[in-house]
Swiss-Prot record:
Signal peptide: none
Keyword field: ATP-binding, Cytoplasm, Glycolysis, Kinase, Nucleotide-binding, Plasmid, Transferase
Top-rank EC class of the record's enzyme: transferase
Species of the source: Nitrobacter hamburgensis (strain DSM 10229 / NCIMB 13809 / X14)
Biological processes annotated in GO: glycolytic process
Localization terms from the record: Cytoplasm
Statement: the UniProt record of this protein carries the keyword Transit peptide: no
The enzyme's E.C. designation: 2.7.1.2
Origin superkingdom: Bacteria
Reactions this protein catalyses: D-glucose + ATP = D-glucose 6-phosphate + ADP + H(+)
Protein name in the entry: Glucokinase
Sequence positions that bind ATP: 12-17
A UniProt-annotated Pfam family: Glucokinase
Family in the record: Belongs to the bacterial glucokinase family.
Length: 320
């Protein structure tokens, strides 16, 4: 017997390099494919090709997409990709009955309630989980920040642009780094330090402070040298990265009252979970003076699921 088309949804996580599409049913997904976005002129071409290749009984009429960039109306423009589209027009072009488009990090945040325990790696002493708001923060291409609030058995997503809030230095050494960064950007956002490019910015700022010429490094170069211990400045850059992420995560926990925990997503730290666990992140997270005991009770967990945005989209409430 064929599957119910109303039970199926096509889901897609559209990044700057790849578009990942899958078919979701009852919170799980299958038929995963990675398509290189450089091969397509528009999103409708990539998604249309994916749908056309599916067996007839697996072609959904409903969809949910996650895109890198703000979603506040019908017209959507991706941040790191020369694609833009109308949600209404895309829905019509593909003959879909419903189509929901959300920010990619919002979709990642929506995955948290559905993550198995094995995909939640504790950073710091394990804490018993309690009910309450959940914060999600993720350094990657940018810095994603979202929150989830429980309400009568469901979760309400609070998306935002917290990665563009002001970067808060917590030590004199960090203040010097921020001063160097301010010579490049009048407003130094958290994302300027807590992202892939931000890690390079930290390395270059430290080189400036140390009076040496920086090597032309990529984010992967910085982390590779840091993990091997072959470059003291890269080691310091990774340490500062983890420390400042702890400060920002602690601020998020206090702001939303994240008694349900703070979850960290993003590919940067996923590859170095042991080094991250032994970094100053957790100490800095708790270092909030009178509220240290409050933060000590809040768990911080690294998301190990490789495609959390797809898991979130698979469970995103859709119009009937």
């Amino acid at each position: 017997m064929g599957k119910s088309m109303t039970a199926l949804r096509v889901i897609g996580d559209i990044g700057g390099t790849y578009a990942r599409f899958a078919v979701a049913e009852r919170g799980k997904y299958s038929e995963l494919q990675h398509l290189s976005v450089s091969k397509y002129a528009a999103l409708k071409d990539a998604l249309g090709e994916y749908l056309a290749a599916l067996p007839r009984d697996l072609r959904p009429t409903r969809g949910a997409l996650a895109v890198a960039g703000p979603v506040s109306g019908d017209e959507v423009k991706l941040t790191n990709l020369n694609w833009s589209f109308s949600i209404t027009a895309l829905k019509a072009d593909l003959g879909m009955s419903s189509l929901v488009v959300v920010n990619d990090f919002a979709a990642t945040a929506m995955s948290v309630p559905y993550l198995p325990e094995a995909d939640c790696y504790p950073i710091g002493p394990p804490q018993s989980k309690t009910s309450g708001p959940v914060g999600v923060i993720g350094p990657g291409t940018g810095l994603g920040v979202s929150a989830l609030v429980p309400d009568a058995g469901r979760w309400i997503l609070l998306p935002g642009e917290g990665g563009h809030s002001t970067l808060p230095p917590a030590t004199q050494a960090e203040s010097l780094i921020v001063e160097v960064l301010r010579t490049h950007w009048p407003h130094v956002s958290a994302e300027r330090a807590l992202s892939g490019a931000g890690l390079v910015n930290l390395y270059q700022a430290l080189c400036s402070i140390e009076g040496k010429r920086p090597d032309p490094l990529s984010p992967a170069d910085v982390t590779d040298r840091a993990m091997r211990g072959s470059d003291p400045t890269c080691v310091k850059a990774f340490e500062v990265f983890c420390s400042m992420l702890g400060t920002v995560a602690g601020d998020l926990a206090l702001t939303i009252g994240a008694t349900g925990g703070i979850y960290i997503a993003g590919g940067i730290l996923l590859r170095f979970k042991e080094a991250f666990a032994s970094s100053p992140f957790r100490d800095r997270f708790e270092d909030k003076g009178r509220f240290q005991d409050y933060l000590r009770r809040i768990p911080t967990l690294l998301i190990l699921e490789e495609s959390p945005a797809l898991l979130g989209l698979a469970n995103l409430p859709l119009e009937p």
